[in-house]
Amino acid sequence: MKIFSVRQTVLPALLVLSPVVFAADEQTMIVSAAPQVVSELDTPAAVSVVDGEEMRLATPRINLSESLTGVPGLQVQNRQNYAQDLQLSIRGFGSRSTYGIRGIRLYVDGIPATMPDGQGQTSNIDLSSVQNVEVLRGPFSALYGNASGGVMNVTTQTGQQPPTIEASSYYGSFGSWRYGLKATGATGDGTQPGDVDYTVSTTRFTTHGYRDHSGAQKNLANAKLGVRIDEASKLSLIFNSVDIKADDPGGLTKAEWKANPQQAPRAEQYDTRKTIKQTQAGLRYERSLSSRDDMSVMMYAGERETTQYQSIPMAPQLNPSHAGGVITLQRHYQGIDSRWTHRGELGVPVTFTTGLNYENMSENRKGYNNFRLNSGMPEYGQKGELRRDERNLMWNIDPYLQTQWQLSEKLSLDAGVRYSSVWFDSNDHYVTPGNGDDSGDASYHKWLPAGSLKYAMTDAWNIYLAAGRGFETPTINELSYRADGQSGMNLGLKPSTNDTIEIGSKTRIGDGLLSLALFQTDTDDEIVVDSSSGGRTTYKNAGKTRRQGAELAWDQRFAGDFRVNASWTWLDATYRSNVCNEQDCNGNRMPGIARNMGFASIGYVPEDGWYAGTEARYMGDIMADDENTAKAPSYTLVGLFTGYKYNYHNLTVDLFGRVDNLFDKEYVGSVIVNESNGRYYEPSPGRNYGVGMNIAWRFE
């Protein structure tokens, strides 16, 4: 993670409702469609902002794990498995996910990267064109609705004058190669009717992978176009497409990891792999109705196709109720979010934001055997007979209200509520002897209030108290398989609810920020992994859990182009009721969550010439199962980078190199929670290297 300057970033209050960058100057980014513009210092919530330019400084630009490891409360781990995405959790929410992102609400330019059921993914984020990434933790994330243990909002750069074209490339260990092209620009300054801004980027990434059977290739395209219609309104078009083909190496037992961490024996036997194709587009209209009123409407639609081959032996698949070892999904999703903001007086200055959010998703899910018989013997890795055929629908309608009250010069109150309603309907089209009609439906409804009080001790020191209630429904994937191995949906799985209280302090220190947050979250009916085997996972409700912790962060810039960033997270996440069958797990640590995380970096980064830096990351041990009988050991990693940036008239050339895991530490990058065969461990590489180049030309 790189350092950002606090004075350079401003946020919409509480980061509510997916802000977008509207205009910019040298010191601030002006954010539209938000109740008011506030700094990170003045936001009464635990929030971190990482600047896009800092994210790209001497990094591969392949994964968010390169640049977000210093965000307190955020546990981001690279599985070394591009078939399953990063493992990402905020304050422990999302740690159970065996693939993709769970328990966290993701947005890219206002378009949800999280489906209506709560399942998300980061593979469509182009780091080459990111303006910034905002990470919200704590009670106010509930105002985003379902699956909001935390919120991550990614904003694409808004094109500015002069027009610029940039080519970039990175080559690293294990045959990893990324290259891309980006064009940005604008006509006018964005304030006059007819002014246009644009950002278009495309990237290709290929790798052999650190482990056996872990190669991947990804093609990604991203575009953002803005048109100033008149002095009061703007129209923005967002487009994104990603195409991934990735082998899946799977997990290893402890003995296998120690013997050879690069091996993937079952993956090669079953030829486990995944393909993903996703295309989406969005349209945002923003209008200033008066000096006191603003409105905006965001519409989007997309489609996603996935095919996955799993490592399931032939014998279980012969059961008439088994869904097979190949999954094919076709998803179509769309949504609309409309909101109105009013600033007025009710004895004190007050701001109201109200709106309505609607999302829906249709899914055609089919299952096939992952083998074909040849002379009576199975040949794995081939699509066989149809074993599952269903159409699933999920949709939500959420009205919301947020208010902000300036009670006095030093005291302010923020309060909001969202009523979240989620419906699920499954229609079974595969009815055979031994496999009956498993159609079913479910609905979930919950009021989600949140509020905070902020007091300004001085102009540079604020303290706050916040509380709220969160809500997390099962995803379609979590509903898809029953723990008893029978056919049909796991409709007995209930949504979880959580209550959070948080106190925090933020202090500006020169050109930097020191922040501290203390919190406690109690959850009922926590959704946890019941079993995981062969790439297939079933889930259950765990009763009560508690997360309590502390987050400390310090970001500072010094004279002479030196930058320092440091953070520490302590998170005690435990079961408050028994979730195990054969022993009492009450009081056990929840798996997949590190109790301690630390990060520190220092860099010398002038505008041009030589630059260099180092960073260190500590990850505490992570339990792999509910019984706490298996765990991934703690580790500390150190990285170094250096480069040279050359500016000559309209040309900028940046050449750099880096080494990661400098001391060649052997470690487990992530765990597969409650893997039934003890294959918990997903190893990460030892010392590895990379070199990169960026060339930009400005048409002035």
Swiss-Prot record:
The chain crosses the membrane at residues 132-136, 150-160, 162-171, 177-186, 195-204, 220-227, 233-241, 280-288, 295-301, 335-344, 350-358, 398-405, 411-419, 447-456, 464-468, 500-509, 511-520, 549-556, 563-570, 597-604, 611-617, 637-647, 651-659, 689-697. It is a multi-pass membrane protein. Disruption phenotype: The PTS-PqqU-deficient strain displays growth defects at low PQQ concentrations. However, the mutant can grow at high PQQ concentrations, probably due to diffusion of PQQ across porins. GO terms for molecular function: siderophore uptake transmembrane transporter activity; signaling receptor activity. One of its GO terms (cellular component) is membrane. Residues 1-23 form the signal peptide. GO terms for biological process: intracellular monoatomic cation homeostasis; siderophore transmembrane transport. Residues 39-157 form the TBDR plug domain. The keyword Repeat does not apply. It is found in: Cell outer membrane. Keywords: Cell outer membrane, Membrane, Receptor, Signal, TonB box, Transmembrane, Transmembrane beta strand, Transport. Residues 162-697 form the TBDR beta-barrel domain. It holds the Pfam family Plug. A motif (TonB C-terminal box) lies at residues 680-700. Its main location: membrane. PQQ is a small molecule and it may also pass the outer membrane without PqqU, through porins. However, this diffusion-dependent uptake process is rather inefficient, which may be a disadvantage when only low amounts of PQQ are present. Mediates the TonB-dependent high affinity transport across the outer membrane of pyrroloquinoline quinone (PQQ), a redox cofactor required for the activity of Gcd and Asd dehydrogenases. The uptake process is energised via the TonB-ExbBD complex. Not involved in the transport of an iron-containing substrate under laboratory conditions. Possesses a conserved positively charged substrate-binding pocket. Belongs to the TonB-dependent receptor family. This is Pyrroloquinoline quinone transporter. The lineage of its organism: Bacteria, Pseudomonadati, Pseudomonadota, Gammaproteobacteria, Enterobacterales.
